[in-house]
Amino acid sequence: MPSSISWGLLLLAGLSCLATGCLIEDSEKSDAPKHDQENSASHKIAPNLAEFAFSLYRVLAHESNTTNIFFSPVSIATALGSLSLGTKADTHTQIMEGVGFNLTEISEAEIHQGFQHLLQNLNKSNSQLQLTTGNGLFIDHNMKLLDKFLEDIKNLYHSEAFSTDFTNTEEAKKQINTYVEKGTQGKIVDLVKDLDRDSGLALVNYIFFKGTLEKPFKADHTMEQDFHVDEATTVRVPMMNRLGMFDLHYCPTLSSMVLKMKYLGDITAIFIMPKVGRMEYVEETLTKEFLDKLLKKDYTGKNTVHFPKLSISGTIDLKPVLTRLGITKVFSHEADLSGITEDAPLRVSQALHKAVLTIDEKGTEAERHTVKGPMALTLAPEVKFNRPFLVTLYDRSTKSPLFVGRVVNPTLH
């Protein structure tokens, strides 16, 4: 290596596409036997991932109360988990504790087995939805990585390793961006904007989800309506609407309307719309335990729901965020990544995460079920998601929050 200190990049990408029409041909329930969920290894780490998700969210929310937020805690935790395999001493401890693991309560073997099982479940074949995760390790072509690290990340985190010439920064960027673009089916492009020629490795993680509502909205009923960003700002957005059975209720504890919508497969989307002026309170109140309560209870009834079509995305610089969670050593000259390579000192210089959320009514099923003409008049309660709300995409099979976010302005992409 040309320098005494080699730099590493931790790059993450996530995509969630929630289409309210049918995106796949076979919508029948899978007959494949399921694992014993109660004894699943992934369930042992699920509470930690949920707490990590809300800890991350609160750090991001404190940075600004006027911006959209969207990220994949599973993607970020998976990348940190795989990176921890090559860390030692305080660098290692900080990552474990930063993600929320107490090593006196759960062993490292159980943690990595939990991630392994989580990834196996998320990547299993399912005709009802598209859910894919990927891990790529781009290694300087002159650097020799330890065999144990390569073996562990491959077996536990399904990582692929690629030889990369970082001195040719343009070609290296192209190689990494092509990997992410392909893995997210072209939805996330140009994740890497800048790359240092002294980089030693880039750890890239992505998650791609494309789901279909069990009960889709109808495209013909979408119309322009007001969305109240704040007391002084109103924007016009295409608002989907449907009369039907919805799991919807008002939660006094959160001062919020809570809407749960199931997607084909094992995904549930939870939307929480606080009363005006109560967003910050909800952000501080929402915990893993409260999320569990919301998921367990069913409030299905006949309602008319108006929900905005939207597509939001954003790139998060994770370095200051993770630093707030106590993960500092890995970014400093004191980093101990000697479990990755012994060729030269190594540290993570950059940690980027990009996630995209799309909610619309595209799809063949929505088109097939579209009824031309105006909606019938009804006395059913009407709820409009026309002000800022929170969103969580939850995988029921692994009990893990795949995505967490806040929609303040649906028109900001």
Swiss-Prot record:
General function of this protein: Inhibitor of serine proteases.
Protein name (Swiss-Prot/TrEMBL): Alpha-1-antitrypsin-like protein GS55-LT
Region of interest (RCL), residue spans: 368-387
Listed SMART domains: SERPIN (SM00093)
Record-annotated disulphide pairs: none
Single Gene Ontology MF annotation: serine-type endopeptidase inhibitor activity
Signal peptide: 1-21
Residues carrying a glycan: N65, N102, N123
Location(s), subcellular: Secreted
Entry domain remark: The reactive center loop (RCL) extends out from the body of the protein and directs binding to the target protease. The protease cleaves the serpin at the reactive site within the RCL, establishing a covalent linkage between the serpin reactive site and the active site of the protease. The resulting inactive serpin-protease complex is highly stable.
Residues with site note (Reactive bond): L377, T378
Family: Belongs to the serpin family.
Cellular compartments per GO CC: extracellular space
Listed Pfam families: Serpin
Keywords for the protein's UniProt record, in alphabetical order: Glycoprotein, Protease inhibitor, Secreted, Serine protease inhibitor, Signal
Lineage, broadest ranks: Eukaryota, Metazoa, Chordata, Craniata, Vertebrata
